[in-house]
Every structure is written in C-alpha cells, then in structure tokens.
Amino acid sequence: LRRLDQLVQQNGGPIDIVGWSLGGIMARLLALHHPDRVRQAISLGSPIRVEDPEANLSESVRRLSQLAGLQRGRRGHDLTEIPVPSTVIYSRQDGVVAPASCLQPVGPTAENIEVRGAHIGLGHNPAAVWAVADRLAQRDGEWAPFEPPSAMAWCYPDPDRAPEPVPRPAGT
C-alpha cells in the first residue's frame, strides 16, 4: 500500500491500474478496498470470479494442476463488482483461464471487451493494447464504453456472443 500511496501522491490523485492474469485480480482488489486511490481498473485474462478454483482453468491446465497438487486448499473469490470504472479484456481462446470466469456484469462504468488470442499473449495483443490505451486516455469523470475504430472492428468479436458469466451461488 505504500507504493500505491506514493503513486497517488506523484499523480496528484487516483491512478489507473492495469493487470494481467493475477495482476488483474490485484488491480481489482486494490480498487475494491481503496477506491479513493484508484481511478479505474483494467484486467486482462483475469479470473475475477471463481466459485471453484478448478472450474476457471482450461482442461489442460486443470489436469497439470491436479498432477502437481496445486489446487488443494484454494478458495473461490468474487471481484466482479468494484466501486470504480472497470474494463475486463478476455479471450475465448485464452487456453489458461475459462473466459466466463473473467466476465463482470456490464453497467454504466463496467464493460467486457473480447479479443482474439491466447492468455500468454494478451499483453502484446494489438487489439488488447489498443483497448487499454483507449481506456487510459479517457478524462476523469468522462468514462464511456469502448468503441473500436471502424477499421479495427474486426479485431473485437461480437459482444452479444459473449459467454455467460459464472453464476453466483444461491443466497449471494
């Protein structure tokens, strides 16, 4: 938190936090617990909602994790709703994280942007990088949903075909 405070002070106010995979979870945790210091959170390929830790993994990663005993004792989490503007960038071809575990409910300052590509390449994916740059360029208090330039529309699959988010358990 000391580093977060330093960055907020250097910036003269809340900062944008961009995170890939686990970094996206950390970005959303900071936004959840310190919304006065975070202007917006952008996550790339981050499983922000996990009821069953094994359910958010691709089949191949799930098998490797089971062989290595990496899943024992892990608990779920739900970071789908945070009190700052947020963008989720995900891919149905991720290969590591189940796409549905990356999605958040869409709202006035919350969106999901699908790109084509693998988990490991999201930080270098031109469509993902363009979307992140567009989100970061927004002025304070003027958040608007992402609209790709018409020449790049083919880079972003139809949002109406997005996978259903991981359902919430009854009573939550």
Describe every region a protein language model picked out:
Residues 116-122:
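Histidine-bearing beta->alpha loop at or near hydrolase active sites
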Residues 41, 86-88, 112-114:
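Conserved beta-strand scaffold positions in the cores of enzyme catalytic domains, especially
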Residues 98-105:
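Short alpha-helix in the alpha/beta-hydrolase fold that links the catalytic acid
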Residues 92-97, 120:
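Acidic catalytic loop of the alpha/beta-hydrolase fold
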Residues 82, 88-90, 94:
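Short beta-strand/loop motif that positions the catalytic acidic residue
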Residues 141-172:
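Alpha/beta-hydrolase-fold serine-hydrolase catalytic core, especially in secreted/extracellular enzymes
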Residues 1-85, 170-172:
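Serine-dependent carboxylesterase/thioesterase catalytic core
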Residues 123-136:
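Post-His helix in hydrolase/transferase enzymes
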